[in-house]
Every structure is written in C-alpha cells, then in structure tokens.
Design a protein with these regions (language model features):
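Peptidoglycan-targeting cell-wall enzymes and recognition modules
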Residues: 2-21, 49-158
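Solvent-exposed, polar/charged alpha-helical surfaces in well-ordered, non-transmembrane soluble domains
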Residues: 6, 24, 28, 45, ...
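N-terminal carbohydrate-binding/catalytic regions of secreted carbohydrate-active enzymes
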Residues: 11-42
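Secretory-pathway/luminal and periplasmic proteins that interact with or process carbohydrate-rich
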Residues: 17, 33, 50-60, 166, ...
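Surface-exposed patches in mature extracellular/periplasmic domains of secreted proteins
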Residues: 32-44, 57-61, 166-178
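Acidic helix/loop microenvironments that form the catalytic cleft of cell-wall polysaccharide enzymes
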Residues: 48-51, 124, 169-187
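GST-like fold's C-terminal all-alpha helical module
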Residues: 152-170
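Low-complexity, Gly/Ser/Thr/Pro-rich intrinsically disordered linker/tail segments
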Residues: 180-205
C-alpha cells in the first residue's frame, strides 16, 4: 500500500514540505520490503518517526550532557567521567560503541564512524557490513551514504524486514519491535503516541 504526503505528514509530524521530500523514498522502501498492511505501515512510520525525530535527523545525536550520559549509559560512565566526556560526541561514540557490534577499540574511531544513521539508525560496523552486503552498497567504506534520503529509507526497510519486524507487526507486538530496534525501551511513550498518529493518518481520521 502507498501513502500520500499528507498521510506521511500526519503520521510523523514532519511537516508538509518534509513529507513531500520523503514520501516516494518511503513508499519505495515499504513496497520493496513488504511493509504493506495498515498495521505494518503504522508501526514502521511510528518507529522511524521516533528514531529520526520526525524524518529530520539522519545521524545519531550524541551531544550528551553529563546528566544525559549517566541516564543513558549508567554502567559506562562514572559521574567524574561523564563530566569529562560531556558535549563531545566523537569521544562519546568511540567509548560507548567500542569493542562491540564489530567495532574496534576506542582509538579505532569505529564507534563514531559507524554511529547511528538513516531513518532507523543503523549502528555498528557489523550492521553496516550486513546492510552493505544485502543492498550492494559500499557502506563500510562510505557509511555517510545512509545520510541520503534514498538509502536512509531503503536501509530502514531492509532492517525492518531482516529482523522479522513485519511478523511482529502482524502479531501486534509493538513493544517487541521497539526492543529489536533500540535494544531497550527508550522513548516508549513517544513511540506509542506516534503509533496512534500513524493509525489515525492511515484511517483518514
């Protein structure tokens, strides 16, 4: 099923001009990756709307305050360390994403190089590499390709289908979808609110 720019605007709160820039890219991705029922579409739009701040941010925001670091990564920073790292996105990424998801040590720079990008925030070397193989894109060498609307949308659809999120949408398991995307329940209230926006937009309410 295809959506209109007006439905996309109402589903994500992105504004009419932004919806016009995105609608064909998102429709193309949803068609390619079988996001093709009202509930699949609603859940997809709710999740990517949250992750991309209403389709307006395609790179992860890591500009955390000390307080934000302690709240988001309480086991990775002491209070003293949080103050030392605050408002330094590159240092933060290289620390919190080091030695996992296929990334190297903090000194490798992989954490920042493979920080979240695209509509669903693909994160980590291994996820970029998997997407690269699936989509035939040089994402390991050029991760910034996911900052382009076409690939941001395609990669989000690929991630959604490859992680079994269409099946979870069919089962109504929205919170489980959040866990698959976020590895936690960050922003659960906003995601839930966006799901209602999307359902209303698709229903024509």
């Amino acid at each position: 099923m295809k959506i209109t720019a007006d439905q996309l605007d109402r589903a994500t709160g992105c504004g009419a001009s932004t919806a016009g820039l995105w609608v064909e890219h998102i429709n193309g991705s949803m068609a390619r990756f079988e996001i093709n029922t009202p509930e699949r579409v609603a859940m997809f739009l709710a999740q990517v709307g949250h992750e991309s701040q209403s389709l307006k941010r395609l790179v992860e925001n890591l500009n955390y305050s000390a307080e934000g670091l302690l709240k988001t990564w309480p086991t990775r920073f002491t209070a003293v360390e949080a103050k030392q790292y605050a408002r330094q996105p590159e240092r933060i990424a290289n620390r919190v994403y080091a030695n996992r998801m296929g990334n190297g040590s903090p000194d490798s720079g992989d954490g920042y190089r493979y920080r979240g990008r695209g509509l669903i925030m693909i994160t980590g070397h291994d996820n970029y590499a998997e997407a690269a193989r699936a989509l035939a894109l040089p994402l390991v060498a050029q991760p910034e390709l996911l900052e382009q609307r076409t690939w941001a949308a395609i990669a989000a659809g690929w991630f959604w289908q490859s992680r079994g999120l269409n099946d979870l949408a069919d089962q109504g398991r929205f919170e489980r979808i959040t866990l698959k995307i976020n590895s936690g329940y960050n922003g659960a209230d906003d995601r839930a609110a966006r799901l209602e926006w999307a359902r209303a937009a698709l229903a024509g309410a």
